[in-house]
Each structure stands twice: as C-alpha cells, then as structure tokens.
Design a protein with these regions (language model features):
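N-terminal Rossmann-like FAD-binding beta1-loop-alpha1 element of flavoenzymes
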Residues: 1-15
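Hydrophobic or amphipathic alpha-helical targeting/insertion segments
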Residues: 13-18, 23, 54
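Conserved redox-cofactor binding core of oxidoreductases
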Residues: 74-77, 81-180
Length: 220
C-alpha cells in the first residue's frame, strides 16, 4: 500500500519483497512462529510472503479501531496509546478507498438502522466489559488481491523497482544509533546484499516489523 501511494511520485523507490510474485512454500516457512494463548491460525498460514501480501488471503472484512481502543483500561495491562483515533482518520479514509469500502458508513447510524429493517442494536459498555460491539463492512471490490489488482501499475511504473526474494535481515544503524544507513537482505540460496537509501520505510506488518527491529541489535 505504501509503494502504491508512491507510484509516479517522482521519487526513486525500491520495494524489498521477502517472497516472490506468488506464494512459495519455502519462503512461507520464514513466517513460522509460536502462538501463545487462545488457539488460532498458525503464523505462516495466516500471512503471505509475496507481492500483495496478505491481501491474497483477504475475504474483504473491514473494521476500524474505535476511539476507546486507544484508552487505558484497568483490566488490560499496559493499555493506552499516545495517539487517538483522530490522528488516524485521514489515513483510514484513504485506506477505505483503496479497499473498496466507505469509511463514513462505519459511523452512519442511519445507514445501518435502515439496513436492519426496523431492528435496533445497542453498543456494549466497553469501558467495564470484555464484551464489545463492532460494525464490519465487507469490500465489494471486484479484485481483493492486490498482487493482481495493482500488478500492471507496478510493471509500468517508471520510478519503482521491486526486488523479489529479498528478506531484510537487519537494519544497519550509524554508530550513534540515530539513523538507518542501510539494510541487509538475503535469499534462501545464501546470497546476501546491502541496500542503501536516503529514507527507509518499515512496512512489514505487526509481527515482522518488531522481528526485524529485534534482530537489528548490532549497537543497541
């Protein structure tokens, strides 16, 4: 999604893709990990390492965070965020357009009341209960797989190069630890390389981002 935003921006962009154009079993192994707590899909089955990422598994179900998701809650240790839902709104609107849904419909009570044909719904008291009520939308986009939907745009792009089978193994910082100077990449054949750039965007998801950060401990 970040690379899509930068198409035809005039910036020279290199997108590092851990997998290939389509899912490959040997690269999916890199997504393995251990789940703790309630049983859920294995980490390598619920994510895809390929162009388009997890959109290749996506059924189109969407739901934004709510304002109180960012609040500190007495029954959730370490809860509370330094940002609010208002900080994300502009990005939610743009993401909704890309996903083929309407951001405003999440908050349009009239729309959902009409859809319920005379029935009504009541939100749970989320501050004092583990129970929650959420409104979901399902995208009616003809093609939900970004690897297909945006393939032609990337192939014809004049400013973006995509490097496949380029798994980031470490962010290389300067000696002060104040900025990233380069990233180390490798493939499963043992080939290694270093990529330098003026700016880096780490956009690998909620699990792979911290994995890479934790592996980047040469100085700190």
């Amino acid at each position: 999604s970040v690379a899509k935003k930068l198409l035809d921006s005039g910036l020279k962009v290199v997108m590092l893709e851990s997998g290939g154009m389509v899912p490959e079993s040997e690269y999916q192994q890199l997504s393995k990990g251990e789940n703790s707590g309630p049983s859920f899909l294995s980490l390598d089955a619920s994510r895809l390492r390929c162009f388009g990422g997890a959109s290749g598994l996506w059924a189109g179900v969407c739901a934004p965070f709510k304002s109180d998701d960012f609040d500190k809650k007495s029954f959730i240790p370490l809860s509370g965020w330094p940002i609010s839902i208002d900080d994300l709104k502009v990005y939610y609107i743009e993401a909704a357009e890309m996903l083929g849904i309407s951001y405003e419909k999440f908050y349009n009570k009239r729309f959902f009341q009409d859809t319920l044909n005379g029935l009504s719904f009541k939100q749970f008291d989320r501050k004092n209960s583990f129970l929650t009520g959420n409104v979901f939308q399902i995208s009616n986009s003809k093609n939900k797989d970004f690897s297909v939907k945006y393939k032609n745009e990337f192939e014809s792009s004049q400013n973006i190069d995509v490097l496949f089978h380029s798994t980031v193994t470490q962010l290389n910082l300067n000696t002060e630890g104040s900025e990233v100077e380069s990233v180390s990449i490798a493939d499963l054949l043992g080939n290694k390389a270093t990529v330098k750039a003026n700016q880096f965007v780490l956009a690998c998801g909620a699990l792979e981002n911290p994995r890479i950060l934790l592996a980047s401990n040469k100085y700190y």
